[in-house]
Amino acid sequence: MKIFNYKRVPYAEMRAFSVHILTASGSFLAFLGVVAAAEHRFIDMFWWLGLALLVDGIDGPIARKVRVKEVLPNWSGDTLDNIIDYVTYVLLPAFALYQSGMIGEPWSFVAAGMIVVSSAIYYADMGMKTDEYFFSGFPVVWNMIVFTLFVIDASATTALTVVIVSVVLTFLPINFLHPVRVKRLRPLNLGVFFLWSALGIFSLLMHFDTPEWALILFIVTGAYLYVIGAVLQFFPALGRET
């Protein structure tokens, strides 16, 4: 007499589910980031956040490779991914901004509140992507914005202005770049993105004591990534293959 009726799990399902576990691990990395931010260890927080973003960058291609949607149709990788993205792209950066007191009281609290509410609404927008894979409206990449504010040691006025402008742009039909999927100027866009990322890592290694030359390059490349989508929107022939 069998007490337990075990069912053999096919290897394909085990492999596919392991990808969901990889994606979900981003939540634990984000939790470690929250702990670090709560203790004002912002350098450590950004390292944890960077590791979470690395996981976010590799889980998608792996999921497509092992056909997760086909093998596990009852498990939504998109929903899981959105949950992790909201925590790592929005909630953790907003908490870090608040904890840092960069904007002062009560505006750090107000700014963080604006970030989390506007971003939650943006995630419900089914039309956030254009036909060319631009984001329509600021794509709530608050991880990049808040990280930039830390790197440049932004003043309260600068930080609050950047937050307000970005929140407003969340709801306007202004294009923002997806550096990988947008085809127009893709080599240049990817080059600028990788340079910005390398400079950010360098700044972390320097504990935000960044040399002036690196700081200028970081600001220029970040500004390019922020505005190039709108530039390509208003100049539709720019970067198109002839």
UniProtKB/Swiss-Prot annotation:
Residues in the Periplasmic compartment per record: 37-41, 98-100, 155-159, 209-214
Protein localization: Cell inner membrane
UniProt key word Lipid metabolism: yes
GO CC entries: plasma membrane
EC class of the enzyme, as a word: transferase
EC number per UniProt: 2.7.8.24
Catalytic activity reported: a CDP-1,2-diacyl-sn-glycerol + choline = a 1,2-diacyl-sn-glycero-3-phosphocholine + CMP + H(+)
Cofactor(s) listed in the protein's UniProt record: Mn(2+)
Cytoplasmic topological segments: 1-15, 63-76, 122-133, 181-187, 236-242
Any one GO molecular-function label of the UniProt entry: phosphatidylcholine synthase activity
Family, as annotated: Belongs to the CDP-alcohol phosphatidyltransferase class-I family.
Function: Condenses choline with CDP-diglyceride to produce phosphatidylcholine and CMP.
Protein name, UniProt field: Phosphatidylcholine synthase
